[in-house]
Amino acid sequence: MELHFADAQQKPENQIKAIRDFIDRGVDVIAFAPVIETGWEEVLQECQKAGIPVILVDRGIDAGIDSSLYTTMIASDHVWAGEQAAVVMAELLSGSGVVVELQGTIGASATIQREQGFDDYMAANCPGIQIVAHQSGDFTRDQGRAVMAELLATYEHIDGVFAHNDDMALGAIEAIQEAGLKPGEDIKIISVDGVKGAFEAVLAGTLNCTVECTPLLAAQIFDTAAALKAGEAVDKWIVSNDDIYTADKVTQEIIDGRTY
């Protein structure tokens, strides 16, 4: 199997340009991770017209877009990830406290769905927990740090932080430490992804939990592309296998074996 790759620099307009280039090259299958949920209908129609199956990777597209325009999606269940983060947060806070939420990129399906899972669970099950702020850190460590510093200056007391990814959580940890507080103790922190740095923080006690969202999807992408090329049917949503990691589960051996 021959692989053609384009780096879109996290810009949807670059992704659309790359997809059109792949159409012009006459590739057999196109796989991409939508930066945001909206704006894909026209280019997906072009793929369909060209007879090229499309695999969505890691993130989905707006539910209002005709799902027949893509063939399958290989991704984590981001709503589930948000729900699991809420379950752990509720336990850590004993059902009562003030929580802030560090959102990912606005408009990204991972942002929307992780927030949905977390907020809906809290609303339905935890009347004593108040989510006082939702602010985007754009999935970056620097922005996570800056946003957390701003929230600490705005709110007199914060009990918990839910970060939509580990990078923002690691930035938030820095901001909390700079404010003279103990992350993981004074302020409980939960994030999503399960990267090596997050595992190290869990082991150190500065991060309470990370909900895994594995990026290691290449094997599934290649297997699915091969199946599509062979004319085989595939599931509409292929869910990746993820887990929840708290201090009782993270070991140095797991950290050493982490490749991302």
Task: Show the residue positions of the predicted features.
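Flexible loop/hinge segments that line or gate small-molecule binding clefts
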Residues: 38, 42-80, 98, 104, ...
